[in-house]
UniProtKB/Swiss-Prot annotation:
Organism encoding this protein: Solenopsis invicta
Function field: Catalyzes the hydrolysis of phosphatidylcholine with phospholipase A1 activity. Induces hemolytic activity. Acts as an allergen.
Catalytic reaction(s) noted: a 1,2-diacyl-sn-glycero-3-phosphocholine + H2O = a 2-acyl-sn-glycero-3-phosphocholine + a fatty acid + H(+)
Record-given protein name: Phospholipase A1
Uppermost EC category: hydrolase
Primary location class: secreted
An example Gene Ontology CC term for this record: extracellular space
Pfam families linked: Lipase (PF00151)
InterPro entries: AB_hydrolase_fold, Lipase, TAG_lipase
EC number(s) recorded for this UniProt protein: 3.1.1.32
Gene3D superfamilies in the cross-refs: alpha/beta hydrolase
Amino acid sequence: MRKFAAIFVVFFVQCTHLYSLAQARAEPDPGVVEYLKQSCVYGNSSYINVYLYNSRFQGKNLGNQQSCQDINASLPVVFITHGFTSSAQVSTFKDLANAFVQKGHTAFIVDWSEAACTDGLPGVQFAEYNAAASNTYDIGQLMAKYTVDLMNKCKIPLNNIQYVGHSLGSHVCGFAAKHVKKLINKTMPYILALDPADPSFGSNKCGERICKSDAKRIVVFKTSILGIGENIIGHLLIVFDGGKSQPACSWYDVPCSHSESIVYATGMVSGRCQHLAVPWTAQQRINPIQWKFWRVFTSNIPAYPTSDTTNCVVLNTNVFKNDNTFEGEYHAFPDCARNLFKCRQQ
């Protein structure tokens, strides 16, 4: 039953927009037309609001303007972007921003909620997913321009700037990084992609999604069936607890598992939690006796490390360093590790 529920979620997100748009065209009701004009369906992606987090401000709304007098140019900077039907006001993003601030960063949360269909009518929002997905390109360009403007006006070097994106926000980061390269002919140093959205992107070519070449280092967390997993889009892929559903969430609550990637990142950034992980390639993740159709929803979970395990690693704040050369595909255990055994520090 749970597998069928998961299938329904994925297919509903990807397909229902077709019916809604067809109905809107066939029956041009004035109310529907007016709603669509104000919605993300019409590409309402002309602006972003940037919220500043540092030791002085806990979410100062800068709009799309710079505020160099409020920023310590010597500190590293992180841009955080949300995904579909989300916003900068969601507590998990605030927690992540504050975790970075506590570790000596300036954090910006990029709010593109209107283009992400956050304010859509209940029951209609999922039908607008593809519109939000299409808007990621324009939002990425706006984020890139803001980044370059920050560099020029506030004298912050690109090597001190990182991108973090969740779900569709991961692709926003990818498009932003591509545009930064076009604008200044330099490559972003680091992107953290938190369960990057698979629907509308998973099978795309490199130029139409976040891609390994967008930054010198890309780290990917996978926590749900909504996230890209088999297509290696980063230098380091960390799959938490099989990458389908997470222990803190009900089996049917796919959005919860999707958002747990933010929670894991926050715990690691803050230093409150470190995870043990073992190598886990695509071949190891798939049970050869399973039907191909079910492979999307099931995995071979490896055994938890013991005192005899030598081929394991410790995932901690080092994962977020630009110069960390640790690469590969790993299965991460969701609980905070109390005993590190013989696992290597990364």
